[in-house]
């Protein structure tokens, strides 16, 4: 049910609510829209851009719906297949947390837009966990023609290649 403050379960009203689900309309200084809420409730995880800190710095994150109804922000999507570090959501790429590690820097990154295809959270997780996407993705050539390829890791596990 949509309310003046956000969204709540229809069973989260009255004197004796039987459900605790309550999602604020504004999370991280960002207004949520009805479509995002519907996808979030269906998948329980959603990658979104446009959140901002109190200082006004914008950032992307993954919202997760916990079993207790809490909404959590999670920037880590998986483990780096190259070095084992954390892969985090960035504005233009999913990056290894060890990129600035002085002793063992890691340059692993998955661009969020590859060949005109906007990678989903699920596709990025597949690349981290299985080293390849499970299905072909629709991409575009420079001339606008469409082609389909799977994405996978190069042998060095540092680069994403089209297969």
Question: Model segments located where?
Answer:
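Basic, low-complexity terminal or inter-domain segments flanking catalytic cores
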Residues: 1-163
């Amino acid at each position: 049910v949509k309310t003046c403050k956000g969204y709540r379960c229809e069973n989260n009203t009255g004197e004796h609510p039987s459900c605790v689900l309550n999602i604020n309309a504004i999370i991280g200084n960002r207004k949520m829209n009805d479509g995002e809420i519907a996808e979030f409730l269906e998948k329980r995880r959603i990658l979104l851009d446009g959140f901002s800190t109190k200082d006004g710095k914008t950032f992307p994150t993954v919202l997760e719906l916990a079993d207790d109804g809490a909404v959590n922000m999670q920037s880590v999507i998986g483990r780096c297949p190259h070095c084992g570090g954390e892969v985090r959501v960035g504005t233009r790429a999913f990056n290894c947390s060890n990129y600035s590690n002085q002793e063992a820097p890691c340059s692993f990154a998955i661009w969020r837009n590859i060949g005109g295809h906007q990678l989903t959270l699920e596709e990025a997780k597949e690349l981290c966990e299985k080293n390849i996407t499970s299905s072909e993705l629709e991409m575009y050539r420079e001339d606008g023609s469409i082609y389909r390829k799977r994405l996978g890791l190069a042998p060095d596990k540092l680069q994403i290649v089209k297969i």
